[in-house]
Structure formats: structure tokens, C-alpha cells
Amino acid sequence: MAIEQAWFMEENDEDQRLPHHRNPKQFVSLDHLADLGVLYWKLNPKDYENDQELKEIRESRGYNYMDLLDLCPERVENYEEKLKNFYTEHIHGDEEIRYCLEGSGYFDVRDKEDRWIRIWIKEGDMIVLPAGIYHRFTLDTGNYVKLMRLFVGEPVWTAYNRPQEHHPARKNYINNVTHKVGVPLEAH
């Protein structure tokens, strides 16, 4: 089943904050994202401090560090420059875990054929991008998102811009996606 918050992107030079749907639109299912190692949950952002499901996810996956990040022109110095940095294609050596508490934005991930898939995260969406997946982030035209960032251990957010085919996390990701190793915690 396809959802209306993930789709194959039309690549062009228009504003990165636009949806960039193909014509006709080509939506992507949660199962397709899961095949790429991307996990998704729909949670209650209004009571995240007491959310039992969030607590269980954090405990089972070892997410013991959390902080909050507000992204909007009024709160981020050099906003346009930061947005350009987030939109540069990169990988991380660790998972990227983001929970959208307010607002919305887009995570773009590369599929197995190197096509961009745009994932629209909105209030209540929690997404986990596996270590080694090529991706980027931008806000949508609302220009605001409040994200919870989750980490295993001390927060490390080092971006390695493409190409990174020899990076250990990238090699491991390719191996896992190719051989479908491991069974992730069930996401919905």
C-alpha cells in the first residue's frame, strides 16, 4: 500500500521546499521504505514526555539521549546556509532518528536504483534512517519544524558528503540492503 507522504521525486532546480512530485505521481509504500532500512512510526507528539510507545521504542533500540531542535528562519542563525548544508547529499556513521513534534519537512533518501524518494514528515511522524543511506533534509514551504533528535550514547552528527562508497557504514548498509540481514523492530 502506498502512502501519500512518500514518493519518487522529480529532479529539477525548483525550490527544494516544494513537493517535487513526478507526473503522474508515484507514491512509495512503507514496505518499500522498510526494504531500504527506513523505519517509521506514527506517535502522539502532544504528550511525548509520557508516551509509552515512544518509551518502548527508545528502550528497545537503545536511544538513551534526546534533544529538541527548532528549525525556522527566526530561530536559526544563517538559516538559508544551514538549510543548504542539510540538503547536501550525505551519509552518517550512525542511524539518524528524528521525531517531528511540530511543523513539517522532507527527508529524501536514495533507493537501490539511486532514485530519490521524498518522505514528508509531519507532526507525530518518527523516522529512522539507517547508517550509510544517502539522504538529505529540507523544510517544506511552511518553513518550520520542531524535531526530537534521538541518539544511542553521546550525540554524534557527522555528515559525510557523497561519494562515500568506501565508508564502513556505507559498505555495511549496502550489504544489509542487498542481503536483507536483520529484522528491525516492527514499525507502523
From Swiss-Prot:
EC nos: 1.13.11.54, 1.13.11.53
GO molecular function terms attached to this record: acireductone dioxygenase (Ni2+-requiring) activity; acireductone dioxygenase [iron(II)-requiring] activity; iron ion binding; nickel cation binding
Main location: cytoplasm
Any one annotated GO CC term: cytoplasm
Enzymatic reactions: 1,2-dihydroxy-5-(methylsulfanyl)pent-1-en-3-one + O2 = 4-methylsulfanyl-2-oxobutanoate + formate + 2 H(+); 1,2-dihydroxy-5-(methylsulfanyl)pent-1-en-3-one + O2 = 3-(methylsulfanyl)propanoate + CO + formate + 2 H(+)
Domain of life of the organism encoding this protein: Eukaryota
Comment on bound cofactor: Binds either 1 Fe or Ni cation per monomer. Iron-binding promotes an acireductone dioxygenase reaction producing 2-keto-4-methylthiobutyrate, while nickel-binding promotes an acireductone dioxygenase reaction producing 3-(methylsulfanyl)propanoate.
Name used for this protein in its record: Acireductone dioxygenase 1
Pathway in which this enzyme or protein is active: Amino-acid biosynthesis; L-methionine biosynthesis via salvage pathway; L-methionine from S-methyl-5-thio-alpha-D-ribose 1-phosphate: step 5/6
Keyword Lyase tagged: no
Disulfide bonds: none
Cofactors required: Fe(2+); Ni(2+)
Binding site for Ni(2+): 90, 92, 96, 135
Gene Ontology terms describing biological process: L-methionine salvage from methylthioadenosine; methionine metabolic process
InterPro entries, sorted: ARD, ARD_euk, RmlC-like_jellyroll, RmlC_Cupin_sf
Taxonomy of the source species: Eukaryota, Viridiplantae, Streptophyta, Embryophyta, Tracheophyta
Gene3D superfamilies: Jelly Rolls (2.60.120.10)
Transmembrane stretches, start-end: none
Organism of provenance: Vitis vinifera (Grape)
Keywords, in A-Z order: Amino-acid biosynthesis, Cytoplasm, Dioxygenase, Iron, Metal-binding, Methionine biosynthesis, Nickel, Nucleus, Oxidoreductase
A Pfam family it matches: ARD
Intracellular or extracellular location(s): Cytoplasm; Nucleus
Membership in a protein family: Belongs to the acireductone dioxygenase (ARD) family.
Positions annotated to bind Fe(2+): 90, 92, 96, 135
